[in-house]
Amino acid sequence: LVEKGVFEIYYQEIGRLDKGMLKTTDINPLNPAQQQAYQSVLQCFREKNVCLLHGVTSSGKTEIYIHLIQEVLKAGKQVLYLLPEIALTTQITERLKRVFGHRLGIYHSKFPDAERVEIWQKQLGDEEYDVILGVRSSIFLPFKNLGLVIVDEEHENTYKQQDPAPRYHARNSSIMLASMFGAKVLLGTATPCVESYFNAISGKYGFVELKERYQDIQLPHIELVDIKELAHQKRMQGPFSPRLVKEIKEALERKEQVILFQNRRGFAPMIECHTCGWVPKCKNCDVSLTYHKGLNQLTCHYCGYTYQVPRSCPACGSVELMNRGFGTERIEDDIKLIFPEARVARMDLDTTRTRTAYEKIIADFEQGKTDILIGTQMVSKGLDFDHVSVVGILNADTMLNYPDFRSHERAFQLMAQVAGRAGRKNRQGLVILQTKSPDLPVIRQVISNDYEQLYYDQSAERQIFKYPPYYRLIYVYLKHRKEDVLDMAADAMAAQLRSGLGSRVL
């Protein structure tokens, strides 16, 4: 039939990318505070290549980003919009698609490899995306005429790729990428990292502040609860104080929503032998293993290795193995016992391993199908929920007691960000902050939302102890199958480095 001319054969490439036309809408006008910040950013870009936008939570930074993107697109250039978490792309994609339609491309690791290859090839072709929205790996996409890079929530440590190689920090790498195109970089956050704030106030970066919340929404009221005394009095209901239980109950009666934050996934951070104190540790990393009840296994959260749960203690033979601490999995079980009628969801790495899992959890919460959302740091990162009136930070101490010079900075950032999810519209939100260390300066700084004081405290300490931003740290990692050879090589290398660098080598 083809030979007789009845049929004709056409070859058409069928891709996985959405190529249909989308109806777009006009961008929202900026309020006076946003307009002033927007003009200040443009002024900074006339003098500096990098600008830090320090805006409080719910101040409407995303609308400023959209106006800036539109200006760059009018000039015929491309935009890279970086986010720290895949979860954030779900909400922001809808906002950006309404404005930019199919000029917007999405890129992150939850897409299949074949789909990511198509995006890569599209960027190399003649019909490339003008705006790329993605996570840290997006910086490696090919661009032809990059004009602006936006790094939202620039303080997040998830921008740093640790393992596997290549090891890089997407914020710093994006600044280098922009310099290759002569493009500008906007760093946006409510809680800047100390290094970025130092660069801003020292004049290396431009600096713009946005201190008003959108539509005059009040900052949430943060109430401190000392759980150390309550635990001694045996008044705690699992990880929940009586005050938090009361507020959750009242919020549910008002048909409002609740977020419970605990930056530890799994059921229990560790198990321990009640008789001899033995704690199972990872054979690769030598850190305690986290118990996951749903999978009935022990998992190392550093390397991902899994172990069977022992029936008895291998050290003394006792069968009295106790769960110590609590993670999001246990919180989910406990809250269902207290509020059996509530609709509860959990958002952590274990429940969001697929591309659609994020979207379903967030969509259900937005549509009011979920009453209580339990989560790790995923719930703290820029998500907007209109009906959240109560946020519970279940144990602030777990964020503070890390052997890391950035632990207090990161604890402040996490608590301030998750507190910002409360009271989004028409009502001041309430944050219940549970801690055993109520007198720590960083706790007081969270309550008063005093970022400047946190910065000056941390900056003074780091200058004394020779930490960034005053010094740079280089970690040299050596590995060999024979320990004696490794020790000898490490000593020899340290001696050579000390001959040139002196006491700066540890």
Residue ranges and their predicted role:
Residues 25-31, 35, 39, 47-499, ...:
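Inter-lobe coupling/hinge segments of SF2-like helicase ATPases
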Residues 2-14:
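A short, conserved structural fragment
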Residues 13-28:
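Conserved adenine-nucleotide phosphate-binding loops and their immediately adjacent elements
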